[in-house]
Amino acid sequence: NELLLNDISNSDSFVVTDSGSIIATFVLRAGEDPTYKEIREGDWLDDGPYATIHRIASDGSRKGIVHLVTQYALAQYDSIRIDTHRDNVVMRNALLREGYRYCGIIHCWNGSERLAYQLIAR
């Protein structure tokens, strides 16, 4: 997959391990994300610099992956943005539990709609 290879070559792809086994993966990228330039039915919490989390995937063997990924991101960046499908209720609830705020709707490069969230370290 070209997208995955690009993430790896840009050093944006990370894994979560447990006892030496990979249990999850995610992308963490600093800087402006083109798909986040326009947001509908809401606004971002601020216009400052941010990092974006993309493509969190877990093997399901452990709960709390969103928490681990968020803590890793917040150790490096003060503002984190993330998006998810409207139907992904599990992810939406996990984001709210972690303190992310719903900000509005964005559209991906392929035109698909996503719900956008932001978390600012306090």
Model feature map: region roles:
Residues 12-15, 25, 55, 114-116:
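Short hydrophobic/aromatic beta-strand element in the GNAT-like acyltransferase core
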Residues 83, 101-115:
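Conserved catalytic-core motifs of GNAT/GCN5-like acyltransferases
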Residues 52, 75-87:
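Conserved GNAT acetyl-CoA-binding A-motif
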Residues 58-75, 93-97:
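Conserved acetyl-CoA-binding loop-helix of GNAT-fold acetyltransferases
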Residues 27-61:
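Conserved acyl-donor/pantetheine-binding loop and adjacent beta-alpha core of acyl/acetyltransferases
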Residues 1-13:
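Active-site rim helix/loop that mediates acceptor-substrate recognition in acyltransferases
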Residues 15, 21-32:
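Conserved beta-strand in the GNAT
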Residues 17-19, 118-122:
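Active-site beta-strand termini and strand-to-loop segments that position acidic
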